[in-house]
A protein has these predicted regions:
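Conserved small-residue
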Residues: 1-89, 197-199, 204-207
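Transmembrane beta-barrel strand/turn architecture of Gram-negative outer membrane proteins
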Residues: 1-41, 93-125, 169-175, 189-199
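Extracellular/periplasm-exposed beta-strand and loop segments of Gram-negative cell-envelope proteins
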Residues: 16-18, 37-40, 82-88, 123-128, ...
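C-terminal beta-signal and terminal closure region of outer-membrane beta-barrel proteins
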Residues: 23-53, 149-153, 203-243
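Extracytoplasmic gating/loop element in the C-terminal half of outer-membrane beta-barrel translocons
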Residues: 57, 61, 113-199, 204, ...
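Generic recognition of flexible, low-complexity loop/linker segments
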Residues: 84-85, 95-98, 180-182, 224-226
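Residues that define the transmembrane beta-barrel architecture of outer-membrane proteins
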Residues: 91-95, 162-167, 188, 231-235
Length: 243
């Protein structure tokens, strides 16, 4: 299917396959590195990839990604050939919640976010598990053992992207000023608080973080493109005084 029409007497049309996200940089020198597409009849941002049958020996001690012949006409990585829609990059469900508890002089606040129903392409593993880039680039610890010598983007590194992230947790204590005679004269209220940012992330994703770009900015929609860095966990101790 395709979309076409007329505007001011000129024929216009939308391509059947339009790449939205791809990989470049270390180990990529052109070729079939397009991963996420805009396609007629599909949700915005779908993974349109060759299907990998696993690792195959290259006959020289290394391994390459076996590719399935989906259309029975011989393996071809061109759009419309041996590729299939393997999932979507945009989450189907997004979670955001702020929960607060209070007990006597203690209070607890928790902020949670999450996303479900989408997939992530682990471009970091595709790139740095490829021994062909070594020693020009560093590789992962497991790379020499697996000895993969291939950079072809298939569904081999496509993973579920579901996650729940505890954005922050804050525990507070309102000090009973009325019981401290020396402070009672000068201080109206005193509160101590301890906050942990980025406490934990629950996810089956094997990369550094499932919280990657979910837009078409920089053509990285749904792709862990090896440039991201996980958010650091920080600890904050706070003191609030009202005179």
């Amino acid at each position: 299917l395709s979309l076409s029409g007329m505007y001011n007497g000129e024929m216009i049309s939308a391509p059947e396959y339009k790449s939205l996200a791809s990989l470049d940089g270390a180990g990529f020198h052109g070729g079939y590195n397009h991963i996420v597409y805009q396609m007629v009849g599909q949700p915005l941002g779908v993974f349109y990839l060759p299907h990998s049958t696993g690792l195959e020996s290259d006959g020289n001690g290394g391994y390459t990604y076996g590719i399935a012949d989906l259309n029975g006409g011989g393996v071809s990585l061109e759009d419309g050939e041996d590729r299939y829609v393997a999932g979507q990059a945009v989450p189907k469900t997004i979670l955001g919640s702020n929960i607060s508890f209070r007990y006597k002089r203690f209070d607890l606040s928790v902020q949670i976010n999450g996303a479900f129903g989408h997939k992530i392409y682990n471009g970091t593993s595709l790139t740095y598990m490829n021994m062909n880039i070594f020693p020009d680039y560093n590789v992962m610890k497991a790379a020499p053992k697996q000895n993969i010598k291939d950079q072809t983007a298939t569904d081999y590194w496509l993973e579920k992207g579901d996650y729940v992230n505890f954005d922050y947790v804050t525990l507070g204590w309102n000090v009973p000023i009325e019981k401290v005679q020396k402070l009672k004269k000068y201080v109206r209220s005193l509160r101590l608080a301890f906050t942990v940012n980025n406490l934990a992330t629950i996810s089956g994703y094997s990369g550094l973080s499932p919280m990657i770009n979910s837009s078409t900015v920089n053509s990285t929609l749904g792709v862990d493109d090896k440039r991201g860095y996980p958010l650091a966990r920080t600890y904050i101790l706070g003191l609030s005084i009202n005179f």
